[in-house]
Amino acid sequence: FMNVLDSTIVNVSLTHIAGDFAIAPNQGTWIITSYAVSEAIFLPLVGWLTKRFGVVRQYIWSTILFTLASLLCGLSFSFNFLLFSRVLQGVVGASMIPLSQTLMMSLYPKEKRGMAMGIWSITVIVAPVLGPVIGGFITDSFSWRWCFYINLPIGLLSGYLVHRIFKSRGYTETYEKSKIDILGLILLTLG
């Protein structure tokens, strides 16, 4: 939810952000683009990272780092630092959606997985719709920075709950040291 929400929550805040950093409004679109592109580039790495570090560990660290990147976005002192923080958000957030699906499937028995994915899908559908509404309210009532700070309690709670749930179930993972195809990654990124 948090990852998808962040793709649209700042859309209505772009003029406020542009005003704060004294940039042209059309430059503000880089805030959205930098996040989306970095997420798309790093999405193919999710499988490799999961094999190397495990699904639960990768999800928890992605969530925590995404939350920290959100904090950095909110604390941004310049437009370039905000762009850097958004790229970081995209990089670490790339694995959150596919891994949340994987974790969801491992929590439910086969006969309830359809229901679980239906509930999961509702959050993914609702988040982009609510993003501009929440972002507009937050920007008008507080500051555009709170569009990022809103992730702090959600991200920390999510990481903690996933850790507790899987630890209480005695979930164990296997890791394998696999090499990454650097040339393939470069070609994929350039494509």
Task: Spell out what each predicted region is.
Residues 1-46, 96:
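Extracytoplasmic
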Residues 59-65, 69, 85, 92, ...:
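Residue-level signature of the transmembrane alpha-helical cores
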Residues 87-122:
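Cytoplasmic helix-loop-helix junction between adjacent transmembrane helices
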Residues 41-80:
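Conserved MFS/SLC helix-loop-helix module at the cytosolic interface between two early adjacent transmembrane helices
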Residues 140-191:
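Hydrophobic transmembrane-helix bundles of small-molecule transporters
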